[in-house]
Amino acid sequence: VLAKFFGSTPANTFVIPNFSIGIRNAISLLPKKLNILLLQEEYPSLVKAFEEGDFNIHKIPMQPEIEEGIEKRLAKGDIDILALSIVQYASGLFIDIEFLKDLKERYPNLIIVGDGTQFLGAHHFNFDTSPFDLVAASGYKWLLAGFGNGVMMISEAYIDMIQKKPLALFNLVFNGHFNILAIASLRFAIKAFEKHDFKLLMKKKDNITQNAKQLLNDIGLIDSWVLQRGQHSSIFILKGEKGVHKKLIKNNIKCVPRGKGVRISFHYYNTDKDLNHLLEILKKD
């Protein structure tokens, strides 16, 4: 079910308890002393997973045109693995996947690792045609699968780098107790996506996301770079801290403080009515 939905090879596709455990299982098989490129202000569990290992860590600052920063650093020629969130949890920035495909052509030995927790379930994805060599994600976010489950996929290039068969990773992942009910929840969520036409659901989500991006920009509540980038996720950081957060919570709008702003997001089940309600509340003094 997972391999079919995500366009991955069944033998290279794994159910995991969550992203943090899965990513650590996978990178524990990597050769030591590899040069890893990470982003500053990246999802902490992704960063710590590599910092806990015997790797050489290199970081570049987070910036609106992050692709330029990545390209400049890779040009030095010493990076073995680029690891990043496909969608940034703290800003909603969506990495340009076409840019990553171009990187793979120019740096054929580069391994690209993606945290897909804020991506899978929110965008159509085919792993085998993507530039990624490892993608891991928890199921509780956009996959709507509840807690205790996740998915991980690896490429043939990743298998070549670890010089082990996929069974070695399988044995790591399934070592010890596994929550069968949580796995069933993940399967249920994926089957529900398929039943209701996932591509159609994503089209609905994309439409409301585009409307929200434009309207929130019109009232000056999101940074200008969000509109300037070719593609953005459905996660937005609204300007304003405690006051905005309290106002939204009071009006039954789910949100969370994030940095110097407030994070909101839209999924396929949100409607224009939801967006209009949000805008009405935000425009009130």
Per-range role (PLM):
Residues 1-3, 8-34, 43-46:
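Conserved beta-loop-alpha segment that forms the PLP phosphate-binding cup at the N-terminus of a helix
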Residues 17-20, 38-55, 63-70:
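Substrate-binding/gating loop at the entrance of the active-site cleft, primarily
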Residues 65-117:
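Active-site phosphate-binding strand-loop segment of PLP-dependent enzymes
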Residues 128-165:
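Active-site PLP attachment segment
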Residues 171-213:
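Structural signature of PLP-dependent enzymes
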Residues 206, 210, 218-251, 258, ...:
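Conserved PLP-binding catalytic core of the aspartate aminotransferase-like
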Residues 247-285:
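PLP-dependent enzyme catalytic core of the Aspartate aminotransferase-like
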